[in-house]
Curated annotation (Swiss-Prot):
<dbReference type="InterPro" id="IPR045357">
    <property type="entry name" value="Aminopeptidase_N-like_N"/>
</dbReference>
<feature type="glycosylation site" description="N-linked (GlcNAc...) asparagine">
    <location>
        <position position="858"/>
    </location>
</feature>
<keyword id="KW-0378">Hydrolase</keyword>
<feature type="compositionally biased region" description="Basic and acidic residues">
    <location>
        <begin position="47"/>
        <end position="62"/>
    </location>
</feature>
<dbReference type="Pfam" id="PF17900">
    <property type="entry name" value="Peptidase_M1_N"/>
</dbReference>
<feature type="topological domain" description="Cytoplasmic">
    <location>
        <begin position="2"/>
        <end position="17"/>
    </location>
</feature>
<feature type="binding site">
    <location>
        <position position="379"/>
    </location>
    <ligand>
        <name>Zn(2+)</name>
    </ligand>
</feature>
<dbReference type="InterPro" id="IPR001930">
    <property type="entry name" value="Peptidase_M1"/>
</dbReference>
<feature type="binding site">
    <location>
        <begin position="343"/>
        <end position="347"/>
    </location>
    <ligand>
        <name>substrate</name>
    </ligand>
</feature>
<feature type="glycosylation site" description="N-linked (GlcNAc...) asparagine">
    <location>
        <position position="99"/>
    </location>
</feature>
<dbReference type="Pfam" id="PF11838">
    <property type="entry name" value="ERAP1_C"/>
</dbReference>
<feature type="binding site">
    <location>
        <position position="383"/>
    </location>
    <ligand>
        <name>Zn(2+)</name>
    </ligand>
</feature>
<dbReference type="GO" id="GO:0006508">
    <property type="term" value="P:proteolysis"/>
</dbReference>
<keyword id="KW-0325">Glycoprotein</keyword>
<dbReference type="GO" id="GO:0016285">
    <property type="term" value="F:alanyl aminopeptidase activity"/>
</dbReference>
<feature type="topological domain" description="Extracellular">
    <location>
        <begin position="40"/>
        <end position="972"/>
    </location>
</feature>
<feature type="region of interest" description="Disordered">
    <location>
        <begin position="47"/>
        <end position="66"/>
    </location>
</feature>
Length: 972
């Protein structure tokens, strides 16, 4: 049945709906029967708070397994015809008990795969109205005996009197009602205040990974693709958008309500379903192929959306050519939201973003922020092909979505910025390093992995999935060549369009396309065999290089492990390939710039003939491989000498690899740290971003181990001596005058990072400069009640550091001013900078106050989405490590009370609070919290935090005193 033949009843508040609405509102925490639709906090506090049913109580995690949550496979959806009526306050009159609820009616066309007498759908925190449910097959009505809800399993079951037969076509009609909550899942509320002080609320959906079931009873698994026809009934004065283009213009007005209808989508997974109801405004453009492109935002932010529009149009045009597949929808909307749980979400045709991920104004956004927006736009638009057009079958292959999108975003952002080389190089800093760090610990997981618990679905959205996935794809592209890689990807997308795929499907297409690349055995490489080694087992190799004789080097491999005593999860412990890999080996010999490639096979060492085994030899030249290198003492000496004599023999990418791998080798006791510091002596001649940035990262990692101990001072002095030549070349004035020049991107960011590093190391010269800017431009120019974006005229790259060191050096008087600016500010990015500055305070009492206010859900001081960032702000403070750990132990119930319903937020707070652990006693406290803390066992972040903390404590035992003596002697 088509939508034209349907009877619409949602405009009428039926008695049964009124009863259900009253029940829902009464049941919602913070709502009462007497709710009005006036825009007060209490009136729309539809918050969800964790309870025993949600979490399994204190002693045990009895949440359902992933298998329990799976739907029976006896029914398959073909299409959904969905109508939703949203009751938003502040626009039209409606019964107060309807405030911040929505009525829903869905007609699901299905086909029976196996005979059955029941239909099971996913449903969570919405109430199905049995009296408004109907099942028909052709012109025959079938009796529904009962409707059973299974809240723990997030399912609703329709028991049918007569058996449904194989291949039978059926139409299930379901009426239901739900809450527009503040849980960031399903249809939720996003709030903001207009410039005249008027509070506003909008309704928007977020359904990935498993929250479409909060919005509509459906088959909420990626493999159940179907066409969606959406109609939204919304208050007069608002606009509605959905995945498809509108088919009735601005909608049909009936009294106080508007009915907006949208074009049926292509076949897609339920998690991509999206709607929004708001009074946002848009700017519009069009691609060369006629795709209408709109950017939506709060009206007062519309002037900041031009860069996103230009970037989006440029990117989608490029992708159509790059993938050789036209964008299949008639329009693409992108929306900047005040409240949003992720950075962005790739809903097909209606991408949602946090405001700080889409808005842009060069007065307030530094070059790095601008690049981040280009990357996120490119990432989400890549998803329109990777994820939307072709979708993984199940979340155990999420990397097919996210790894590919992370990989492709750097290609797309290269087109947006017109600087492909910059994006490829930045990949090393922001993606490859992140992946190597995440995959070095025992709490990692393979790219393709078995999901056993429901919580693991959300936990799969991590650095392994995103960063390692992208890094492995980058290595594969370098191995087979860009054209073959692009062609294989295009063929994969075409073959599985509007369908689902697994990793094996991807590699099978590569096998068809890639037939002439020599593999490790000298025969044509089979991509399936090669790639599976990197996707089905966790970890990565470190290649050890040793001199075998005067003309031969011996290369061997082993798994790189941050802590060899840590134990993997049982299901990852015995992989098929035994933690061995066939490794494409790029290398450089002596003082030659030529890069050669060979293979190190997984089952045998490589004896490599070289012209002079006594010459320096570098592995992973240009750093496209997902592995590390190590050398014997003599090998490192030769590399160090080459860097001192002529470091430009190696490209900046190769120098980046050498420095990173040296720090990594020292961290696992493979070499002495003195070797690393000797290597860094060449840095006084270094001017390139990639090597210096990774050097500063390594230095920072060491200094974190010293914390605020007295021994930290000589260490800081030593590190300042290494960076002093670059600091003397860096200038705040140069940054302020040139940051808008995109060609100076790396130069600007390098100078800024060096200056900030010097400040962090305790340089009074640096801190005084920032403090003077704070006094001159903030304290002297900002009047009471002004927002920072109204009164602070500091160059965008400097704003965050000026605020931070203003508070750090100025104390309470500066903190009070920043607090005032923070309260008045409406630009999300500026608010982030100001909140970070509050975390820079030297007073622990002030830091505690910041966290307590952040957790207070009766206050709007910190938006819920920003709570993890507030914890990270405090954790970044050198004095915050011990304090924030104690805060976690003592205030765990408060943390759960505040954000316990957002699993991913708690997963981010735990590592922030444990990043400063320095003793075994603290580890024991953490283990006790994991075992006995309310609901703590459900959070996988504890295992990771305990492992990293143990690594940190072990490092301190092994290296602290020795390095303290070294730094003291070196700085006498």
């Amino acid at each position: 049945m088509t939508s034209q033949g349907r009877t619409r009843t949602l405009l009428n508040l039926t008695p049964i709906r009124l009863i259900v609405a009253l029940f829902l509102v009464a049941a919602a925490v913070g709502l009462s029967i007497g709710l009005t639709y006036y825009f007060t906090r209490k009136a729309f506090d539809t918050s969800e708070k964790p309870g025993k049913d949600d979490t399994g109580g204190k002693d045990k995690d009895n949440s359902p397994s992933a298998a329990e949550l799976l739907l029976p496979s006896n029914i398959k959806p073909l299409s959904y015809d969905l109508t939703i009526k949203t009751y938003l306050p502040g626009y039209v009159d409606f019964p107060p008990e309807k405030n911040l609820t929505f009525d829903g009616r869905v007609e699901i066309s299905m086909v029976v795969i196996e005979p059955t007498k029941s239909i099971v759908l996913n449903s969570k925190k919405i109430s199905v109205i049995p009296q408004e449910c109907e099942l028909v097959s052709g012109d025959k009505k079938l009796e529904i005996e009962s409707v059973k809800e299974h809240p723990r399993l997030e399912k609703v079951e329709f028991l049918i009197k007569s058996q449904l037969e194989k291949d039978q076509q059926i139409l299930l009609k379901v009426g239901y009602i739900g809450l527009i909550s503040n849980s960031f899942g399903g249809i939720y509320q996003t709030t903001y205040t207009t410039p005249d002080g008027t509070p506003k609320i909008a309704a928007v959906s977020q359904n990935e990974p498993i929250d479409a079931r909060r919005m509509v009873p459906c088959m909420d698994e990626p493999k159940y693709k179907a066409n969606w026809t959406v109609t939204v009934i919304h208050p007069k004065g608002t606009k509605a958008v959905s995945n498809g283009i509108e088919v009735n213009g601005d909608g049909e007005i009936s009294g106080d309500w508007i009915t907006s209808k949208f074009l049926t989508t292509p076949r897609m997974s339920s998690y991509l379903l999206a709607v929004m109801v708001s009074e946002f405004e848009y700017i519009e453009g069009e691609t060369k192929t006629g795709v209408r492109f709109r950017i939506w935002s709060r009206p007062e932010a519309k002037k900041m959306t031009q860069y996103a529009l230009q970037s989006g149009i440029k990117c989608i045009e490029f992708y159509e050519d790059f993938f050789d597949i036209r964008f299949p929808l008639k329009k693409q909307d992108m929306i900047a939201l005040p409240d949003f749980s992720a950075g962005a979400m790739e809903n097909w045709g209606l991408i949602t973003y946090r405001e700080n991920s889409l808005l842009y104004d060069d007065r307030f956004y530094a070059p790095m922020n601008k690049q981040r927006i280009a990357r996120i736009v490119a990432h989400e638009l890549a998803h329109q092909w990777f994820g939307d057009l072709v979708t993984m079958k199940w979340w155990d292959n999420l990397w097919l979505n996210e790894g590919f999108a992370r990989f492709t975003e750097f290609i797309g952002a290269g087109q947006i910025t017109q600087d492909d080389a910059r994006m490829r190089n930045y990949f090393l800093i922001d993606v490859l390093e992140r992946a190597l760090k995440a995959d070095s610990v025992a709490s990692s997981h393979p790219l393709s992995f078995r999901i056993d618990k429901a919580a693991e679905v959300e936990e799969a959205f991590d650095d392994i999935t995103y960063a390692k996935g992208a890094s492995v794809l980058t290595m594969l592209r370098a191995l087979i060549g860009e054209e073959k890689h692009k062609h294989a990807v295009s063929q994969y997308l075409k073959k599985f369009s509007y369908s689902n795929a697994e990793a094996t499907d991807l590699w099978a297409v590569f096998d068809e396309v890639v037939t002439d690349v020599e593999g490790p055995d000298g025969k044509p490489m089979k991509t399936t065999e090669f790639a599976s080694q990197w996707t089905t087992q966790m970890g990565f190799p470190v290649i050890s290089v040793a001199e075998f004789n005067s003309t031969t080097l011996k290369l061997t491999q082993s798994r790189y492990e941050a802590n060899k005593d840590a134990v993997e999860k049982e299901k990852y412990r015995h992989p098929k390939y035994g933690f061995k890999w066939d490794i494409p080996l790029w290398y450089q010999e002596g003082d030659k710039k030529e890069i050669k490639r060979t293979w190190l096979r997984r089952d045998e060492p490589l004896y490599l003939h070289v012209s002079d085994a006594g010459a320096p030899f570098v592995v992973n030249a240009d750093r496209y491989g997902f592995y590390r290198q190590n050398h014997d003492a003599n090998g490192w000496k030769k590399i160090i000498k080459q860097l001192k004599d002529n470091h430009e023999v190696y490209s900046p990418r190769t120098r980046n690899a050498i420095i990173s791998d040296a720090f990594a080798a020292a961290a696992t006791d493979a070499i002495e740290y003195e070797t690393v510091f000797e290597l860094l002596n060449y840095a006084e001649k270094e001017t390139e971003y990639l090597p210096l940035e990774i050097a500063m990262s390594g230095i920072s990692s060491i200094l974190k181990y010293f914390g605020t101990e007295p021994e930290a001072k000589p260490a800081q002095t030593y590190m300042m001596n290494i960076l002093k030549p670059m600091y003397e070349k860096s200038s705040i004035d140069f940054i302020a005058n040139n940051y808008r020049n995109d060609k100076l991107f790396f130069q600007i960011n390098l100078q800024k990072d060096v200056i900030d590093m010097f400040c962090a190391l305790g340089s009074q010269d640096c801190r005084k400069k920032y403090k003077k800017l704070f006094d001159d431009e903030v304290m002297n120019k900002c009047r009471d009640g002004q927002a920072a974006t109204e009164c602070v005229r500091i160059a965008a790259p400097l704003r965050s550091s000026v605020y931070c060191y203003g508070v750090k050096e100025g104390g309470d008087y500066a903190s009070d001013k920043v607090m005032e600016l923070y309260t008045a500010e409406t630009l999300a990015l500026e608010k982030d900078f100001l909140r970070l500055a509050l975390g820079c305070h030297k007073d622990v009492t002030a830091l505690k106050g910041l966290l307590l206010r952040a957790l207070d859900r009766n206050s709007s001081f910190v938006r819920m989405q920003d709570i993890p960032s507030a914890f990270n702000d405090v954790a970044a403070n050198p004095i915050g490590g011990e304090f924030i750990f104690n805060f976690l132990i003592e205030r765990w119930p408060d943390i759960i009370e505040s954000i316990g319903t957002k699993h991913t937020y708690v997963e981010k707070v735990i590592p922030a609070c444990t990043s400063g652990i320095r003793s075994q006693q603290q580890i024991d406290q953490l283990k006790n919290l994991q075992k006995n803390g309310m609901n703590a066992r459900q959070f996988g972040a504890f295992d990771k935090a305990i492992e990293r903390a143990q690594n940190r404590v072990d490092w301190i035992k092994k290296h602290f005193q020795k390095l303290a003596a070294f730094f003291k002697k070196a700085t006498l």
